[in-house]
């Protein structure tokens, strides 16, 4: 594979062992399964499943967990999670950042700002989030995200 991006950090709100996040979990797992032998993936995700109040019990916290063809870091909620993201992205041991969503403050907007400050390349995979139906749900929040992006010069 003639890819110059061999080390990729992926952000997704939910991942295995969770299942409540549905399709995005399967999409990211399939990406890792199909291309993980050629690309070194590091996934940053939540330490709990969608809607759960307690973290997973079968993961190691504050360190990378090998899961299939990727290393996964499960971040904690609140300010501690933002600090963890900042520390992980500051390491700069990656070529590219892949954001699996656009409308997540923790897993898209914040990493996008940090990546811009660090001059890192970014790929956005919004997975249908800009469809008319999707935009009508929680529309005020999405309107703010869309309006803030060009004002912060985050599009390049």
Annotated model-derived regions:
Residues 3-21, 25, 127:
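Nucleotide-activated donor-dependent transferases that construct or modify glycoconjugates
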Residues 8, 96, 112-132:
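Active-site proximal beta-strand in glycosyltransferases
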Residues 14-18, 34-79:
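N-terminal strand-loop element at the rim of the active site
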Residues 16-17, 105-106, 122-140:
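A short, histidine- and acid-enriched strand-loop-helix "catalytic/donor-clamping" loop
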Residues 22-35, 149:
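Short amphipathic alpha-helix
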Residues 87-107, 118-123:
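Short N-terminal targeting/anchoring amphipathic segment
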Residues 117, 142-156:
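Membrane-proximal helix-turn-helix segments that form the acceptor-binding/catalytic region
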């Amino acid at each position: 594979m003639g890819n110059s991006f061999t080390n990729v950090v992926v952000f997704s709100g939910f991942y295995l062992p969770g299942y409540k996040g549905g399709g995005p979990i399967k999409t990211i797992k399939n990406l890792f399964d199909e291309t993980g032998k050629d690309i070194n993936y590091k996934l940053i995700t939540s330490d709990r499943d969608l809607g759960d109040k307690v973290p997973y019990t079968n993961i190691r916290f504050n360190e990378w967990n090998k899961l299939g063809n990727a290393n996964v870091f499960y971040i904690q909620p609140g300010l501690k999670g933002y600090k963890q993201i900042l520390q992980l992205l500051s390491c700069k041991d990656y070529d590219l950042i892949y954001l699996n969503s656009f409308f997540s403050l923790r897993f898209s907007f914040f990493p996008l700002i940090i990546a811009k400050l660090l001059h890192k390349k970014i790929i956005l995979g919004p997975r249908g989030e800009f469809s008319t139906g999707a935009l009508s749900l929680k529309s005020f929040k999405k309107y703010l995200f869309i309006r803030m992006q060009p004002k912060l010069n985050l599009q390049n």
